[in-house]
């Protein structure tokens, strides 16, 4: 399974420098940046690159990392070709709590590491997670448009993105149990998350 996160932000220097910057950065570097930025109360970050390395500066922290020779995916084509006929609205806080509890059980699941079964039916989500010795079932209320659906998704992947959502409502757009899922903050059209179901 794979995932893609798209975030659009306005840059202060974007008017001065019209040149586009497209870089692939190691995931470990991004994870490190996120962890450090959560500890520091700083909203401004300086990013510079010569193409082979990227320099980040914020507060009194400086990070230099290499870039990866990997073409950025054509996310617009992926999103434009994604078809969805089901829309699920969930309370972000409740959904996050359910995902966190389920993640404890599914992290060592031998059949599908971090895999949970998401059953959307009658304006409810029943989330089931299984470990070697135990099973958890969590149910929360949803607003559901379209038919019922049962799908297996990576709980950890969802948790990583949904923990960044600031709005009260999380939106899931789905088609079937083999097609892509789009996750977004109802109040933020500049960020969305794309993931595939588990086999």
Predicted features, each with a name:
Residues 1-6, 14-68, 83-199:
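DNA polymerase processivity clamps
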Residues 71:
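Feature marks short, surface-exposed loop/turn motifs that line or immediately flank catalytic pockets
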Residues 75-77:
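Specificity-determining recognition surfaces
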């Amino acid at each position: 399974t794979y995932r893609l996160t798209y975030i659009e932000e306005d840059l202060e220097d974007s008017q001065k420098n019209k040149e586009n910057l497209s870089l692939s950065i190691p995931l470990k570097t991004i994870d490190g940046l996120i962890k450090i930025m959560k500890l520091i109360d700083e909203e401004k970050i300086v990013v510079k690159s010569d193409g082979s390395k990227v320099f980040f500066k914020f507060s009194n922290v400086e990070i230099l990392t290499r870039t990866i020779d990997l073409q950025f995916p054509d996310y617009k084509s992926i999103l434009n070709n994604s078809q969805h006929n089901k829309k699920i609205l969930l309370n972000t806080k409740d959904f996050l709590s359910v995902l966190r509890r389920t993640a404890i059980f599914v992290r060592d699941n031998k059949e599908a590491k971090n895999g949970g079964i998401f059953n959307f039916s009658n304006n409810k989500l029943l989330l089931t997670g299984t470990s070697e010795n135990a099973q958890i079932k969590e149910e929360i209320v949803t607003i559901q448009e379209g038919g019922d659906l049962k799908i297996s998704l990576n709980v950890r992947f969802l948790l990583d993105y949904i923990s960044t959502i600031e709005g009260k409502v999380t939106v899931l757009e789905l088609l079937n149990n083999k097609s892509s899922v789009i996750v977004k903050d109802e109040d933020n059209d500049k960020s969305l998350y794309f993931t595939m179901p588990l086999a």
